[in-house]
A protein has these predicted regions:
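A short, proline-enriched helix->beta-strand linker immediately N-terminal to the Walker B motif
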Residues: 116-120
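Single conserved hydrophobic/aromatic residue that forms the stacking wall/gate
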Residues: 161, 168-169
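Conserved ABC ATPase "signature" region
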Residues: 33-35, 68, 75-93, 144-145
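Short coil-to-helix segment of the ABC ATPase nucleotide-binding domain corresponding to the Q-loop/switch region
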Residues: 57-65
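Hydrophobic anchor residue at the start of the ABC signature
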Residues: 111
Length: 169
């Protein structure tokens, strides 16, 4: 999704995610109306520009949080967290706190958290905006690889056409 600042891109994502309510119309996902479904029951992962990691939780706890909300048994949650960390090449980082990670590592944790519960759709609000050029290019490749390997639909927002053409999946 491409548009200038203030054009409603983030608002659109927030409505898809269920954090804001549309004033008119309905939202459909895979042919089903989801407008009145709570965010945690929509099956949508979200990656924010600022990562939105819980600073008081470890990497493992950040990834396990959406699974706890969905009441996934711990043994199954452990497997899902391991799989998500593997997808973003962060095995062995489970016990670290977000502040102990680089910006790129934090972003990969945010991506893993958006995927850990096997969503139908992943929304990304300027997910690479805070990263330097080299890291941004590396993360674009990783996100594209994840998209291709697991087949999840990704909607990404950008305010600049220069970044938009780089992130087309």
């Amino acid at each position: 999704m491409l548009g200038p600042s203030g054009s409603g891109k983030t608002t659109c994502l927030m409505m898809l995610a269920g954090f804001e309510t549309p004033t008119h119309g309905e939202i459909y996902l895979d042919g089903n109306v989801i407008s009145n479904i709570p965010p945690h029951k929509r099956g949508i992962g979200m990656v924010f520009q600022n990562y939105a990691l819980f600073p008081h939780m470890t990497v493992y706890e950040n990834l396990a949080f959406p699974l706890r909300v969905r009441k996934i048994p711990k043994d199954e949650a452990d497997k899902k967290v391991d799989k998500a960390l593997s997808m973003v090449s962060l095995q062995g980082f489970e016990a670290r706190m977000p502040m102990q990670l680089s910006g790129g590592q934090q972003q990969r944790v945010a991506v893993a958290r958006s995927l850990v519960f096997d969503p139908q759709l992943v929304l990304m609000d300027e997910p690479l905006g805070a990263l330097d050029k080299n890291l941004r290019e590396s993360m674009q490749y990783e996100i594209k690889h994840i998209h291709e390997s697991i087949g999840v639909t990704v909607v990404s927002v950008s305010y600049t056409h220069l970044r938009a053409h780089e992130t087309i999946l």
